[in-house]
Curated annotation (Swiss-Prot):
It comes from the Bacteria. Involved in mRNA degradation. Catalyzes the phosphorolysis of single-stranded polyribonucleotides processively in the 3'- to 5'-direction. This is Polyribonucleotide nucleotidyltransferase. Its main location: cytoplasm.
Length: 731
């Protein structure tokens, strides 16, 4: 087909499937656009940027949008409106995955707005669209005029039967103990995100290394793609980023401010200032210095503030590298003081308060019925979720004022990380048939709140009596590297988060890692450094676990009296209609009468949730009566409900809640061993009689027999009782 356009297509085999990039075919008005195909998964990724830098900001304004389209999986959106609306949590997490490895690869001082849009057009579940989007974003930026210092590549690494697998299929992913996303450049790993089933540190390092080997192939492929695109006019020359050095200003500020800031930091360490005292002290000093320098350089307020922040960062880094002392006086491997508490809230199902230094998280567990699961309406194959963790970060936790308008991307990301850390220890539905929701409320924040949420949630789960596989703890780590000097920091706080070269969060049990999130900002982080960092993180994790287990060593044996009790039973799937009734009439009546929640699965599993145990047992009894099978050949004590000329109707299973019981017909010929002229001669309405189930007629109606329930010998004896002759005397 002739398009009249220059089109470039190129592909590479990754994990046995073709990864194809197409440029020049669609969305050509964007600065960079690529159609990425990985198997049958297709994603359009575009990159655009503003012509001028944004004034008055001190950050890089990058926005990433990940747009899910339901047509990609042949679905129409649910709900009334029938079109896509706000991004799902999965879409937000995918956007964060794209953002994190590319953000550090723009020049310092670049302030132009950059917008990445990844639109999912077609999905084959074996080829995850978020990985295609990550590689597509890298390619689109590489083709654009934007000063991107990439490209990067991205893959997923799984662990199936102790073998590392690149980009596992859905079938392999179900068996995998690891889901590890690795993104990086030719020279360095930039980002790692993992969920794992207690995977040891050494295997995690091996998986990261294996993933980076595959990433290098993708990076080389994108570089070749750009070279060919340039020849066809499908790639643009990179723009120059001119950042005025202002050497004279920097020299003047540094000369005066460095000794003053160093002295201030020494004082903070010596007198053990807390976060508020430290922030106030440093801000006041920097404000005084800024005011002074503005007299000479009145147009340079932002620049002066930036120089002062850089000086502060450098002093704190050097203090750590040269002396091994952090700004709060701790050693590099030291964890802040910890205290924990459980059972704070009397009416909740479980609660845990975790405090580490000036980071404090209150986690609350709620147990629900099977029907309380979250219904998922996205592009994935999962339809529901029975374990949820939600994270809230109110402004008061950092002493700030700002409007509260629901969870932002950061809160969704932190909540998902903690959920991923805890999920491997949550008992399966067969063992613990509850829906579990945890909410972590950040009450104080000075770094590492997501890992604090993991710890608080573990305490709350054990307080709630959830039989978790093992307790989980998490710790946030940092790395500072200059040349050959390296310092690894355990349990970083807020001020240390921004000044490091790598920050990573590790959660797990005593046996292995359950979640890992790592962002690396520099090249040269070797395998040895990663190994040492994860080993130090394990030491910190074990210390934290020890403190938690001092408060509660195992899950409680009993649930909260306010938690629902779930009674489980199974019935023949054919009997489900007997429980539900026409238009749901019967099940509604059971629920109204007992106050329970009833969830019925298509396979016949029934879950009854009731706070009152007696109510649950009452509902179970009703269901058992409704579904009770009448066994042919068995004798029942029944009640005569109606008399007809041709026989008597007998109820063998009594009705409940005004609902009919189960009855059958005793035909007149089955009433007695002798001939019966009138039914009333043998039984009357209201009589209780023994009957035997003898089968069903061709319409499925139960047939009963009274005579078969009474042996003929017994009947004869009643008609002709034996004559007892009097004994003769003397005999």
């Amino acid at each position: 087909m002739t398009t009249g356009r220059q089109i470039l297509e190129k592909e590479i085999m990754i994990a046995g499937r073709p990864l194809k990039l197409t440029a020049g075919k669609v969305a050509t008005q964007a600065s960079g656009s690529v159609l990425v195909s990985y198997g049958d998964t297709v994603v359009l990724v575009t990159a655009t940027g503003s012509k001028e830098p944004r004034e008055g900001i001190d950050f890089f304004p990058l926005t990433v949008d990940y747009e899910e389209r339901f047509y990609a999986v042949g679905k129409i959106p649910g709900g009334f409106i029938k079109r896509e609306g706000r991004p799902s949590e999965k879409a937000i997490l995918s956007a964060r995955l794209i953002d994190r490895p590319i953000r550090p690869l723009f020049p310092k001082g670049f302030k132009n707005d950059v917008h990445i849009v990844a639109t999912v057009l077609s999905v084959n579940q074996d080829n995850p669209p978020e990985i295609a989007a990550m590689n597509g974003a890298s390619a689109a930026l590489t083709l654009s005029h934007l000063p991107f210092l990439g490209p990067i590549g991205a893959v997923v690494v799984g662990l199936v039967e102790d073998e590392l697998v690149i980009n596992p299929t859905i079938e392999q992913a179900e068996k995998s103990r690891l889901h590890l996303v690795v993104a990086g450049t030719r020279d360095a790993v930039m980002m790692v995100e993992a969920g794992a089933q207690e995977v040891p540190e050494e295997i995690m390092i091996e998986a990261i290394t294996r993933g980076h080997e595959e990433v290098k192939k993708i990076v080389a492929f994108i570089e070749e793609f750009r070279e060919e695109a340039l020849k066809l006019g499908l790639a643009k020359e990179k723009m120059e980023v001119v950042v005025e050095e202002k050497a004279e200003l920097k020299e003047a500020v540094t000369a005066e401010a460095y000794p003053l800031l160093k002295e201030a930091i020494e004082k903070i360490i010596a007198e053990k200032f807390n976060k508020q005292e430290r922030d106030e002290y440093l801000e006041n000093l920097k404000k005084e210095l800024t005011t002074k320098f503005l007299e000479t350089y009145p147009e340079e307020e932002l620049t002066i503030k930036g120089i002062l922040d850089s000086i502060q960062k450098e002093i704190v880094r050097q203090k750590i590298l040269k002396e091994g002392i952090r700004i709060d006086g701790r050693k590099t491997d030291e964890v802040r003081p910890i205290w924990c508490e459980v059972g704070l809230l009397p009416r909740t199902h479980g609660s845990g308060l975790f405090t580490r230094g000036q980071t404090q998280v209150l986690s609350i567990v709620t147990l629900g019925a099977v029907g309380d699961v979250q219904i998922l309406d996205d592009l994935g194959i999962e339809e529901s979720k029975r374990f949820m963790h939600h994270y809230n970060f109110p402004p008061y936790s950092v002493g700030e004022v700002r409007p509260m308008r629901g969870p932002g991307r950061r809160e969704i990301g932190h909540g998902a990380l903690a959920e991923r850390a805890l999920e491997p220890v949550i008992p399966p539905e067969e063992v613990f048939p509850y829906t579990i929701r945890i909410v972590s409320e950040v009450l104080e924040s000075n770094g590492s709140t997501s890992m604090g949420s993991v710890c608080g949630s573990t305490l709350a789960l054990m307080d709630a009596g959830v039989p978790i596989k093992a307790p989980v703890a998490g710790v946030a780590m940092g790395l500072i590297k200059e040349g050959d000097e390296v310092a690894i920091l355990t349990d970083i706080q807020g001020i240390e988060d921004a000044l490091g070269d790598m920050d990573f969060k590790v959660a797990g049990t005593k046996d292995g890692i359950t979640a890992l999130q790592m962002d690396i900002k520099i090249a040269g982080v070797t395998r040895d450094i990663l190994t040492k960092a994860l080993a130090q993180a394990r030491e910190g994790r074990m210390h934290i676990l020890g403190k938690m287990l001092e408060v509660i060593s195992e899950p409680r044996k009993e649930l909260s009296p306010y938690a629902p009790r779930i009674i489980f039973t199974t019935v023949d799937p054919e009997k489900i209609r007997d429980i539900i009734g026409p238009g749901g009439k019967i099940i509604k009546k059971i629920i109204d009468e007992t106050g329970v929640k009833i969830d019925i699965e298509d396979d016949g599993r029934i879950f009854i949730a009731a706070v009152d145990k007696e109510a649950g047992e009452k509902a179970l009894n009703i269901i058992e009566n409704l579904t009770k099978e009448i066994e042919v050949g068995k004798v029942y004590l029944g009640k005569v409900t109606r008399i007809a000329d041709f026989g008597a109707f007998v109820e063998v299973v009594p009705g409940v809640l005004g609902l009919p019981g189960k009855e059958g017909l005793v035909h007149i010929s089955q009433l007695a061993h002798s001939r019966v002229k009138r039914v009333e001669d043998v039984v009357k309405e209201g009589d209780q009689i023994l009957v035997k189930a003898i089968g069903y007629d061709n319409q499925g109606r139960l047939k009963l027999s009274r005579k078969d329930a009474i042996p003929a010998e017994e009947v004869r004896e009643k008609k002709n009782p034996p004559i007892h002759k009097p004994r003769r005397e003397g005999k």
